[in-house]
Amino acid sequence: MCIRDRVQSEQGILGGIYGGKKSNFLKCKKFLNSFCKSVFNFGDVSKASSAKLLSNFLSLMTTTTVIEFFKSAKKLNIDIKLLCDVARLGSGNSGALDRIADKAIKGNYKGYVFSVDNTYKDLNYINDLVSDLPNANKLSKMAKSFYKQASIKGFGNLLVSELIDKEKY
């Protein structure tokens, strides 16, 4: 499994997650290194799958927060460039902010290349994975409800960062 998308694959900077027999790891790693910056062995397939979903959980929750950060700043008429500059100096700095901010400040909301429907699908899997962890389950359900509503409103094919430009979903 790989982390990120086709563009990063072509650049050879993906993160690879391996799950399977230890004896096959080196063979697979050699192949994965042709398009991955790093490859991580999580042991068996189920742990690798869970690791991928947990990685997506962190990414999607952070991305959802960045989207709502932009929407809130717009609604409150706060200079988003200045606010992003402040966020980047503290704990609010993140890969999601970096992928979205510079383009969104200029009115291009295609910075996070992952669709609303794919996000909703992943959050369903994540919600199942963390079903016995009360707080993680609540967080994933909350985010899942955002993307479910966006999909119902016809935004399923949009990139998640394009939701910044939608008033309500």
Model region roles, listed by residue range:
Residues 4-56:
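Rossmann-fold dinucleotide-binding core
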